[in-house]
Design a protein with these regions (language model features):
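Class I SAM-dependent methyltransferase Rossmann-like catalytic core
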Residues: 1-41
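Core SAM-dependent methyltransferase catalytic element
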Residues: 214-232
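Class I SAM-dependent methyltransferase SAM/SAH-binding core
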Residues: 52, 57-108
Length: 232
């Protein structure tokens, strides 16, 4: 989730991590999410598929890749994405130039929001909001659930002190350059299952066996730290 402007050091860090980790991660995520979307909906029977990307950030590369991949596979279906984050007016002018993708401030996603979506993507966002803010997280997910047929959540599992520190380090490296808030805690398996239970969601599938970085990340690339949950 993008929060604000950054200085020169942060911009340099952002460019560095883009080269050594993010392109590869984005390719893995794009393939996984696109494949699951194809499995969940009878896409070729629909003229339009609408995606909601919550906390999409300033880097538009992932949602662009997903739209492009789905569009090339299903040529008779139009894919449209609405992306919400804490964008400034200046940022919205800069990034709102991509066909079939619209970027809006998160405030536009009000309780009176009438648009309906086939899928809501919540990609590595919830832990940045702050999992200690239980009510806020619950209200956000509840709102997204009301307007979306499926929720696709990508997030992290921690298992104790060491894994918590490992994930904090990874988040610092990956997100400090964008001015994103670095979290203190992450889901564990129990807290995530309590989270979806309170929302009365059904988990259709959980993906926990994928590596999102190249081999040289060693322990940091432990697949048990990452998960994708598909909910309805």
């Amino acid at each position: 989730m993008f929060l604000g402007n950054v200085n020169t050091f942060r911009k340099s860090l952002s460019k560095f991590k883009e080269i050594i980790s993010q392109k590869y991660r984005r390719e893995i995520l794009c393939n996984l999410i696109s494949n699951e979307i194809t499995k969940l909906e009878e896409i070729d029977k629909k003229k339009i598929i609408r995606l909601l990307d919550y906390g999409s950030g300033y880097n538009t590369a992932l949602i662009k890749k997903i739209i492009k991949k789905l569009s090339s596979k299903h040529k008779n279906t139009k894919f449209i994405a609405d992306c919400y984050d804490n964008y400034s007016s200046k940022q919205l002018k800069l990034i709102n130039n991509i066909q079939n993708i619209k970027f809006m401030h998160i405030k536009n996603l009000s309780n009176k929001h009438k648009a309906r979506y086939n899928f809501c993507l919540i990609i590595d966002v919830l832990h940045h909001i702050g999992l200690e803010k239980n009510i806020k997280i619950h209200n956000i997910a509840k709102k997204l659930k009301k307007i979306s047929k499926f929720l696709i959540i990508k997030d992290h599992f921690q298992y104790g002190f060491i894994s918590n520190l490992t994930l904090i380090f990874m988040d610092f490296f990956s997100n400090y350059g964008e001015g994103t808030k670095i979290p203190k805690i992450y889901f564990n398996i129990k807290t995530f299952e309590n989270f979806i239970s309170k929302l009365k969601l059904k988990e259709i599938k959980r993906i926990t066996d994928k590596k999102y970085y190249k081999w040289f990340w060693f322990y940091l690339n432990n697949e048990k730290f990452q998960f994708i949950s598909i909910l309805k």
